[in-house]
Each structure stands twice: as C-alpha cells, then as structure tokens.
Amino acid sequence: MSTAVNTIRCSLLLLGLVGIYTVWISSFRNGLFLRNEEFAGKGQLPGTPNATLRTHFTGIDTLDKALGIFVVFYWPVCQGNLRSLSLIAFPAAVGVGEMWILFALQFSQSNSPTRAMGKMAMFGMGLMLVGPGIFLPIYCSLDLSSTHRLDDSPSSAAEGHLCRNLRSCLLGGYYILVILLALPSPAVVSYGSKQGIIALLQGWPLLVSAMLWLTHLCGKDRTADFQATLSTARTSIYISAMACATISHLVPLLISLLADSSDICPGKVFVPHLAWPSRRVTSVEEGLLRFFQWDYGLGSLALLLWAVGLHIQRRQQISQGINYLRLIPEALFLSVMMSPCGAAALYLYRHNSTNCASKTGDKSGSG
C-alpha cells in the first residue's frame, strides 16, 4: 500500500477520534443528551408544548422507550423552529442517503446478493446508531485495505439487478419518509404520525434492504448483455448522487448567503462550533445544530478521503501516475462547489470508469 493511501487511512482514524469527542463526548458535556432524556422522561417534545410523546410504537416496551428517545432527539429537526438547524439538516439527510448508496455499489460487487444486502443493512444501521461522523471514518480506514480486491471480481446478473434497483428502493424506503417529515405539523401531518415516521426512519436501512430483497426475488433479469446494463446502472447512480449532493449543498448555502439575518450566515450554519468542555447549550435545537455540524461534516469528509484513496489506489494498480499538486486543490474546490459527498461521488465515478476501461483492455488483450 502506498504512502499516500496509508496517510489517508491514518487521517481517517484521526477523524474518527475527533468524532468521538465532538459528537458523543461533547454532547454529554454540553447538556444535549441530558436535555433529551429530560424531555423523554416527561413525555414532552422540545419546541412543541401542545404535543405529547407517543409511548407505543411496536408493543415492545424496551424498543418503544428507545424509539421514544430517538423521536425526542430528531423532533426539532423536522419542526423548523431554528432556521440554521433546518439548513444543515437538509444536506445532512440527503448526504446520509448518498453515503449509503455509494457504499452499496461497492457491496453489490459481491457475487452473493444475500451477502451484499446484508452488508448494506449493517452498514446503514451503523450510520444511524453510531453516526456518520464516527462510524464512517473508522469504517473507511479499515475498508481501504480490502476494497481494492473487489475491483476485478467478475460481474454477475444479480449484481446488475441490485444496481438497477438501488436508487428506487432508497427513494421509497428513505427519501419519501424524509420528505414526509418536512411537511408541516399538525396542518398536514399529525404529531402522532410524524413521530411514527421518525421511529420508522431509525430502521430505514433494514427497510431498503428488504425492498431490494423482494425485487431480487420477484424480478428476473432478461437482459442478455448484463455487463453493459450494469455499467449504465452504476453510471446513473454516480451521476444522480453527484446531482443530489450538489443541490442539497448549494440550496442551503445560497439561502444562507442571500439572507439578511445574521442567524443563518454561513459561518453559523456550516462551520462547526468548537466543542469547549465548559460551553453548555441553552436549548435542544442549539445542541442539535452543533451535533449535526460535526457529525455530518466529519462523515462527509471521511467519504471524500475514502473515495480519493480508492482513486489513488486504482491508478497505482494500473501504473498510472498521480499529480498530487493538482489532486489536493481539485478536491478542495470540488468540496466547496459540490459538497464533499458530491466530490466523493465524482471520484468514485472516475474510479469506476478506470475499472471499466481496465477490464475492457484486459478482454481485448486476451481476445
């Protein structure tokens, strides 16, 4: 493994340690988690005094209590009481979906659909339960040492079927639920229904994986040249991931830049607050703003470093040089213009194109 890739792996591990402090430890020290537990214990929802917390979701007491805590935690995000929180929550929600689907493409390279979908489900639950700011840097660091072995694995019709259904299943099992959360309450969606949607979202990776499994069981691949359709499916996913990440990044950024209010200036929305031990939050909304700034920021940066690492790794495997003086400023520029998630999708698209060109060259040479 090259020095550059090793440096990226070490940087990812360092990001994971930073995430443990800024996302978890800091949230304990600044009072966010304590306030969350207080609201859950009283059966109240922060910022909505006329609504009560649901106590029944699944009928299993332990699971219902855990889901109630998650509902209280995410409730201010979908109510829009703090505009800066809404602006950072939009790219964060889209970013989590794009993080998942970009890794799902890597998992689908396994010849076993069951194994691939199992990895998708576990990876997604890791994102939800641990948080992308902690889970993703550590996972990406470990993954860089093994993912390259999948690049030359033979494609299968099952892999093509998974890739063609990834986007539609993610839309139905995740993004539609996120859109429903953005609808006003109680005018359009009742308080109880919105709490149920938040609870359901905690297991969206399992839901999306189950939808993929059903499409795999019910669908039959009638395409003779699945290699061509697989390449098309991958390309469309990378392009849509770039588009979604870029739009969700630029829209809040432009709103923040053009707004007259200093409360939603870019520095207060997108720049993480320093996690000083003595700095307490005055509300759950303020604590969530800090939480998402660090969690989404570190997670998206880890995704970009992982994608760049794969790009470097593959180019070195096929004996192509890397111009680091060009690569570093290019990655920084793309991060500003497209978001780190969008830039990661672009580098993964280049990585996939390099793999396809390499395989085509190998087949031509062997023919």
From Swiss-Prot:
The keyword Glycoprotein applies. Signal peptide: none annotated. The chain crosses the membrane at residues 8-28, 57-77, 85-105, 120-140, 169-189, 197-217, 239-259, 292-312, 327-347. It is found in: Membrane. Its EC number is 5.4.99.-. GO terms for molecular function: isomerase activity. Glycans are attached at residues 50, 352. This is Terpene cyclase verU1. GO terms for biological process: terpenoid biosynthetic process. It comes from Penicillium polonicum. It comes from the Eukaryota. The gene is verU1. Its main location: membrane. Terpene cyclase; part of the gene cluster that mediates the biosynthesis of the neurotoxin verrucosidin, a methylated alpha-pyrone polyketide that inhibits oxidative phosphorylation in mitochondria and thereby causes neurological diseases. The carbon backbone of verrucosidin is synthesized by the HR-PKS verA, and further modified by the other verrucodidin cluster enzymes. Keywords: Glycoprotein, Isomerase, Membrane, Transmembrane, Transmembrane helix. GO terms for cellular component: membrane. Belongs to the membrane-bound ascI terpene cyclase family. It is a multi-pass membrane protein. Pathway: Secondary metabolite biosynthesis; terpenoid biosynthesis; Mycotoxin biosynthesis.
